Regions:
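Conserved hydrophobic beta-strand positions in leucine-rich repeat
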Residues: 68-71, 107-109, 149-154, 178-181, ...
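Amphipathic alpha-helical interface elements that mediate macromolecular binding in regulatory proteins
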Residues: 29, 33-37, 56, 86-93, ...
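C-terminal closing repeat unit and adjoining cap/tail of repeat-based domains
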Residues: 2-20, 419-526
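N-terminal helical submodule of small eukaryotic multi-pass membrane proteins
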Residues: 319, 342, 355-367, 374-375, ...
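Leucine-rich repeat
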Residues: 2, 21-247, 254-256, 450, ...
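Plant-skewed but cross-kingdom recognition/interaction modules and surfaces
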Residues: 196-313, 319, 399-420, 462-479
Length: 526
């Protein structure tokens, strides 16, 4: 009936001059309401308001739309007068009142003004008026009463710090997703929440103040039985984060202020955990994580705080970064088939970082940067982690200088079952006058490296001379099981390297492929 009425209005409005009636094809009017609402969901609130003036039919359609995107800047531009903002909120409140009982599926409220074009003008990128803030909160509560399911509030450009955020919003039974981005508004757990069961599945809080951290996370643990995602980004006043949930699957904590004192997580179904602590954060008094089904872990902080990866039996990938040392990345399966170790340039001690995954067996694929290779050489014979089962190794090296060659030998000696070797040219790059001509093929043969008898594939980037060419010769002449080799050269030395290596007395029947390094990569190098 509603669709027929809309088509009648469209036809009746198309009378030509002189009384002659013409019918106009109105495809939009023929659409079901559900499809029409999907199309309208791409419009801002201002556009919906304009469209509602076309006809009574369009007004009813706009008012019944379940999706709204309110952007204050699109409505009043650079105006910074509180009166203008209050009039705008009057229109919004009127619009919400006219909706009656129509349900809101998603409401996005954006009051994040861009910086003023003229810095010397009186215009500001934020409105510090309390009246405007409380009127906005009043509008938000009206939205909540419309049984909203998804609510996104970007209020960074609104109000002064430490204004209260209405905790009654957390008591909305229909609410499934809530995102709050404020100018350090104060959040508290709802007071009458002892018997309330929230349907929240996704809660994202950014730049907010958690006034009662113990009470707030107790409310999440006890009342949010359906929650799956919890994000806390640049939150304030969280000293104790204690959370217990059987439904939570993703937890993210980024740079809490001030530093955490306790972090206790007990989430049996947690699959993704991301923790980013501030640099040089002090040691926590309590750090306990129970997550038997954890699959992905990201941890960033200082050496004072780190998890024990051995506890996570279902872990598929992990990256642990320390501001003063470097990072360890582990990928795929609980035995970590891919491991990346990147140390900072001047780090000379690998042992603190290795404590993160002490006792684990690193299998399959290993990627090392130059700093890590040098540290392993210093720790030869006393490495706290075994790499005996590594089958694929990639060395990211700036240049194969005389200084790095003994370190490379040390690493290769600890991997007797290596099948794939890739030596890649990566920053930091050394000066051209660096010594690169002290180790010939004879040196490599004297090392009696066990991996050479199992090596099947190798790739090497030759962008400088002698040491790296001699290493390539060693592989070609001694790797009897070699199946394929790829040699990447710059355009300037491709033919010369090819002529030199073609003279090798290869012990295998491997296919050797010579490739020119792409120009885009050469520009990055030189």
């Amino acid at each position: 009936m509603e669709r027929q009425k809309r088509k009648f209005v469209a036809a009746a409005s198309c009378e030509g001059e002189g009384g002659r009636r013409r019918r106009m094809t109105d495809r939009f009017s023929n659409l079901p309401d559900q499809i029409a609402h999907v199309i309208l969901s791409f419009l801002t609130m201002a556009d919906l308001a304009r469209l509602s003036y076309v006809s009574k039919c369009w007004r009813e359609l706009c008012l019944s739309s379940p999706v709204f995107n309110f952007n204050e800047y699109n409505c009043i531009g650079d105006a910074d007068m509180c009166d203008s903002k209050l009039r705008l909120l009057n229109i919004l409140e009127r619009f919400l009142s006219l909706r009656a009982d129509h349900k809101i599926q998603r409401f996005r409220f954006d009051w994040h003004l861009p910086p003023p074009k003229n810095q010397s003008s009186s215009s500001s990128s934020s409105c510090g008026c309390r009246d405007v803030y409380y009127r906005v909160m009043s509008c938000v509560q009206k939205v909540v009463r419309c049984n909203v399911e998804q609510l996104e509030l970007n209020l960074l450009g609104l109000g002064e710090p430490n204004l209260k955020f209405p905790s009654s919003i957390f008591l909305c039974e229909s609410l499934k997703s809530l995102s709050v981005y404020t100018n350090r508004a104060i959040l508290r757990a709802p007071s009458s929440s002892s018997s309330f069961s929230s349907n929240l599945k996704d809660l994202q809080l950014l730049n907010v103040v958690i006034a009662d951290d113990e009470g707030f996370f107790k409310w999440i643990s006890c009342s949010c039985k359906c929650i799956r995602k919890l994000g806390l980004d640049h939150t304030y006043m969280i000293k104790n984060l204690n959370i217990e949930s059987s439904s939570l699957e993703r937890l993210s904590l980024s740079y809490p202020q001030p530093d955490l004192d306790t972090l206790n997580i007990s989430c049996e179904n947690l699959q993704l955990l991301s923790i980013s602590l501030c640099p040089d954060s002090p040691c926590m008094t309590s750090l306990n994580i129970f997550a038997p089904n954890l699959k992905k872990l990201w941890w960033e902080g200082s050496l004072m705080n780190h998890p024990n990866l051995r506890k996570f039996q279902s872990l598929e990938s992990a990256e642990v970064c320390f501001d003063s040392v470097g990072k360890v990345s582990l990928e795929k399966t609980q035995k970590f088939k891919s491991t990346v170790i990147e140390l900072k340039t001047r780090v000379d001690d690998f042992e603190p970082l290795s404590e993160v995954f002490h006792g684990l067996r690193i299998n399959e694929v290993l990627i090392l940067n130059e700093a890590a290779i040098k540290v392993m050489f210093k720790l030869e014979g006393s490495m706290p982690v075994s790499f005996n089962n590594v089958q694929s190794l990639r060395m990211n090296i700036g240049c194969v200088t005389d200084e790095i060659v003994p370190s490379m030998v040390s690493v290769l000696r600890g991997m007797p079952y290596l099948r794939i070797l890739y030596i890649k040219r990566c920053p930091p790059f050394h000066e051209l006058e660096s010594n690169k001509c002290g180790f010939d093929i004879g040196y490599w043969k004297l090392q009696n490296l066990a991996f050479i008898n199992r090596l099947e594939f190798f790739t090497i980037e030759i962008l400088e001379w002698y040491n790296v060419v001699e290493l390539a010769r060693y592989v070609l002449e001694c790797a009897q099981k070699l199946k394929k080799g790829v040699i990447i050269c710059s355009a300037q030395n491709l033919e010369e390297v090819k002529r030199k290596l073609e003279k090798c007395k290869m012990i295998s029947t491997a296919a050797i492929v010579f490739k020119e390094r792409p120009k885009s990569e050469r520009r990055l190098l030189f």
